[in-house]
């Protein structure tokens, strides 16, 4: 069995999981998520834990087993705790501001870059050079954070740009002077 796939998913108090065919719905204190899973995988709920099982030991089924279990575990954690990614703006004059629910970035272009959050995503700006992307869907939080970072990725010579908190930027040596 897949080492990841065979581990049961504990369902915390206040979280409701329903399985209808291929559709898994997870409802918790922070919201509701639903995801369609591969038809080969089967899910059983027994005494407060959810188990994912696979039909055979084929390579594809082994991979889907661990994937399905992890996706459902991420949904359960998302509706209980939520997810967030922190981005840092490094550079002179690089600033972020929240206007309503929009995020406005001044990152060295001739115009400010405006981001509208997709449903389920919230922006927080604790400092002018810091942005927190929060939500219950792990994949969506990561994608929105990656889209924001892509507006001005860190450059290797001065390290200016938008980077994830804790991300190490590989630096290059500039050209040698005479």
Swiss-Prot record:
Signal peptide start-end: none
GO terms for cellular component: cytosolic large ribosomal subunit
Pfam families in UniProt: Ribosomal_L6 (PF00347)
Keywords on record: Ribonucleoprotein, Ribosomal protein, RNA-binding, rRNA-binding
InterPro entries the record matches: Ribosomal_uL6-like, Ribosomal_uL6-like_a/b-dom_sf, Ribosomal_uL6_a/b-dom, Ribosomal_uL6_bac-type
Assembly and binders: Part of the 50S ribosomal subunit.
Homology family: Belongs to the universal ribosomal protein uL6 family.
Function: This protein binds to the 23S rRNA, and is important in its secondary structure. It is located near the subunit interface in the base of the L7/L12 stalk, and near the tRNA binding site of the peptidyltransferase center.
Protein name stated in the entry: Large ribosomal subunit protein uL6
Species whose genome carries this gene: Symbiobacterium thermophilum (strain DSM 24528 / JCM 14929 / IAM 14863 / T)
């Amino acid at each position: 069995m897949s080492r990841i796939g065979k581990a049961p998913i504990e369902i915390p108090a206040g979280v409701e999981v329903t399985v209808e065919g291929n559709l898994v719905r997870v409802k918790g204190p922070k919201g509701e998520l639903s995801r369609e899973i591969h038809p080969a995988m089967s899910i059983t709920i027994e005494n407060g834990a959810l188990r994912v099982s696979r039909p055979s030991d084929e390579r594809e089924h082994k991979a889907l087993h661990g994937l399905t279990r992890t996706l459902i575990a991420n949904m359960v954690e998302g509706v209980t705790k939520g997810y967030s990614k922190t981005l840092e703006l490094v550079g002179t004059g690089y600033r972020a501001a929240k206007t309503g629910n929009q995020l406005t970035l001044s990152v060295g272009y001739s115009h400010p870059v405006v981001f509208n959050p997709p449903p389920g995503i919230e922006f927080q700006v604790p400092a002018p050079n810091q942005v927190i992307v929060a939500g219950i869907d792990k994949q969506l939080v990561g994608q929105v954070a990656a889209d924001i970072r892509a507006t001005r990725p860190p450059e290797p010579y001065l390290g200016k740009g938008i980077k994830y908190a804790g991300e190490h930027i590989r630096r290059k040596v500039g050209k040698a002077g005479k």
